[in-house]
């Protein structure tokens, strides 16, 4: 399940709507803190319609309490869902954000938002190592202006990371070795050619005998 799918599912929830009104600490501890690990992120924050952080939970990777701007929340109110990247003191963070609605409005087009739900994960060395394993590539997190020349021994693909205003804040540089070993293919080709020549020789030999 993707993080986008998760945040879509969790943000049409009557209990969450009620929490934005009551700001009940016990509810937050039971249903958000208690289930935090299942979200597979480093940060969850819930904001009210006043654009003020109600509460948060985070791993030790993210110590910054509030990195979401009022300007962004006003934009989120209109668009309902967003994914973007932002630079904070700890590094580059991938953010998933959605408005909060009751359970009878899964498409979020019948009711006004009750608040905002924010999930984030740090693009950390462990995150990159996992991505390297999945993609079989060497990956670097580099600044927005970084560039690297292609060479004949590898394929380099930059992935731009955009903020919510569509500005590049960083890049993930995927590099994969392009070492094609033609020796095996060459051996197979030689065998095929030899077999073909032998076939012709045998054919000519027997055709002469029967003439």
Question: At which residue positions do the language-model features occur?
Answer:
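Cytosolic-side ends of inner-membrane transmembrane helices, especially those
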Residues: 195-211
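Membrane-interface helix-start motif
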Residues: 130-132, 171-195
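Short, positively charged
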Residues: 17-29, 136-146, 175
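Extracytoplasmic/periplasmic sensory segments of membrane signal-transduction proteins
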Residues: 2-71, 75-77
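Short N-terminal helix-loop-first-beta-strand/juxtamembrane motif that initiates sensory/input modules
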Residues: 2-9, 34-53, 82-85, 114-123, ...
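A short beta-strand signature within small-molecule sensing/ligand-binding domains used
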Residues: 79-83, 90-107, 115, 150-162, ...
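Short clusters of small/polar residues that mark proteolytic maturation junctions
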Residues: 57-59, 97, 173-174
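Short, acidic, Ser/Thr-enriched surface-loop or helix-capping motifs
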Residues: 48, 162-163
């Amino acid at each position: 399940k993707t993080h986008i799918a998760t945040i879509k599912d969790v943000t049409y929830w009557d209990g969450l709507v009620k929490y934005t009104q009551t700001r009940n600490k016990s509810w937050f501890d039971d249903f958000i803190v208690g289930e935090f690990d299942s979200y597979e992120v480093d940060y969850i924050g819930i904001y009210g319609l006043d654009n003020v952080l109600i509460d948060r939970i985070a791993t030790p990777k993210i110590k910054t309490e509030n990195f979401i701007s009022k300007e962004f929340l006003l934009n989120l109110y209109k668009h309902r869902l967003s994914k973007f990247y932002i630079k904070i003191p700890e590094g580059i963070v991938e953010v998933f954000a959605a408005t909060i609605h009751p359970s009878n409005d899964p498409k979020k087009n019948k009711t006004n938002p009750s608040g905002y739900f924010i999930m984030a994960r740090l693009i950390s060395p462990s995150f990159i190592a996992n991505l390297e394993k999945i993609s079989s590539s060497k990956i670097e997190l580099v600044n927005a202006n970084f560039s690297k020349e292609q060479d004949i021994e590898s394929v380099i693909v930059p992935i731009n990371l955009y903020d919510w205003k569509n500005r590049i804040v960083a890049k993930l540089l995927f590099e994969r070795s392009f070492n094609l070993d033609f020796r095996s293919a060459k051996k197979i080709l030689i065998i095929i050619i030899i077999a073909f020549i032998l076939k012709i020789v045998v054919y000519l030999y027997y055709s002469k005998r029967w003439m």
